[in-house]
Amino acid sequence: MAGNKSVVYHGTRDLRVETVPYPKLEHNNRKLEHAVILKVVSTNICGSDQHIYRGRFIVPKGHVLGHEITGEVVEKGSDVELMDIGDLVSVPFNVACGRCRNCKEARSDVCENNLVNPDADLGAFGFDLKGWSGGQAEYVLVPYADYMLLKFGDKEQAMEKIKDLTLISDILPTGFHGCVSAGVKPGSHVYIAGAGPVGRCAAAGARLLGAACVIVGDQNPERLKLLSDAGFETIDLRNSAPLRDQIDQILGKPEVDCGVDAVGFEAHGLGDEANTETPNGALNSLFDVVRAGGAIGIPGIYVGSDPDPVNKDAGSGRLHLDFGKMWTKSIRIMTGMAPVTNYNRHLTEAILWDQMPYLSKVMNIEVITLDQAPDGYAKFDKGSPAKFVIDPHGMLKNK
C-alpha cells in the first residue's frame, strides 16, 4: 500500500485531508506483533475532536485525528490469536493493554502500560495521549488486538445496523458510563447537562437502565428537539428561569436523583449567560439540582491545560466550584473517560436485539466522505444537530 488518506490537524480550525504513510505493525520503531491493521468502515466526528479543532486541546501539527472507529481486519501480527482477516470489529477509543493492574481491574480508561507519552495517564487514538494515530483515515493501526477489539459475530447483521453500532467505540459507552456512574436505575429521575451527541447517548443509556424521567438541558433548540421528539423531557437553558424551577415544572420537585455532565470544560452559563463560556457552569448547576445523597457522573472532558482559556485559573484546569454545597449534600461524583470494554459488548447486544429503537432518532446520523470531513467539523462547531459519520470506503452508502 502506497498511502493512507486521512484527516490531518494543521492548527486551530485548520484540518486537511492528506495522504499519510500506510500503517505498519509497529509504533515508535517497536514491532507490534499483538497489533492489527484495519480497513476503516466508519469513523465518527466526536465532541472531543471539537476541543482539538477549536484549539482547546493540544495535538501536534500533522497528527491524524479520530478515535471512534469500526473496521475490518486486513493484516495482523503473529501474536494475534482471536482475530482473523476479514473480521468486522469495533475499536474502543481507549488504547489499553489488558495486562496491567488497571486493565485487570476493569479500568482500561487509565491503562498503565502504553507509556509513549510519559505526561499522559491514559491512551487514546487521535489525541496527543501516548502518540497513537487516529482513525479518521482509510486504514489504522490498533495495538493489543485480542484485548481491545470487539468482533461482530455476524458481519452481515452488524452492517445492517452499522449506523447504531458505530457509536459503541466511544459515545454510547461514554454516555452510558455517565449514567452508571450517577447510579441510574429503574425509577430514577435524571438530569443530563448537554444535548450534544454524548448527552443524547446518555439519555438513551438512562432509558435503557430504566429511568422513569430523563431531562436534558441545552442552549441548542435543534438538538433538544431530537430528544423531545423521542419522548425525553428537555429544558432550554436560554430561559431565564432558574434551573431548579424548570425541573420543578416537570417533576413537581426541584431536584433529581442522578446527574450527568455531558458538556465538560467548554460549558456555557444559564439564562442571560447562555452565550458566555463558563467552565464551571455545568458542574455547579448539577450540584444545585441533584438531591442530597444523589450522584453525578462526569464523562464530559476537563483538561489540565487549556491554550485559550476564559480566565487564568481555567487555563490550568482550576475551576471555581460550589464544593461546599456538594459536600453538604453528600453527593457522590465520578469523573474520567469511560472504560469502553466494560460496556461495548452489552450495548451491542441491546442494539442487535432492538432494545434501543430510539437511538437512531436521537442521534440524527449524517454519513459523509473523508473529503467532506473538514466541512463536517465546521458544521459541528456551529452547533449542527447531526452526528457526522465518515465513510472512507463508501461501505455505508445503502445502510
Swiss-Prot record:
Activity regulation (record text): Inhibited by the substrate analog pyrazole but not by NAD analogs such as AMP, ADP, ATP or N-methylnicotinamide chloride.
- In which organism is this protein found? Pseudomonas putida
UniProt similarity note: Belongs to the zinc-containing alcohol dehydrogenase family.
Taxonomically, which superkingdom?
A: Bacteria
| GO MF entry, a single one | nucleotide binding
Which enzyme type, at the first EC level?
A: oxidoreductase
State its role.
Answer: Active against a range of primary alcohols as well as some secondary alcohols. Exhibits higher activity against alcohols with longer carbon chains.
Sorted UniProt keywords: Metal-binding, NAD, Nucleotide-binding, Oxidoreductase, Zinc
- Protein name according to UniProt: Formaldehyde dismutase
Q: Where does Zn(2+) 1 bind?
A: C46, H67, D170, H177
Query: Which parts of the sequence bind NAD(+)?
Result: 47-51, 174, 197-198, 218-219, 223, 263, 268, 299-301, 336-338
Q: Which cofactor does it need?
A: Zn(2+); NAD(+); NADH
Task: Provide the assembly information.
Answer: Homotetramer.
What detail does the entry give on cofactor binding? Binds 2 Zn(2+) ions per subunit. Binds 1 molecule of NAD(+) or NADH per subunit.
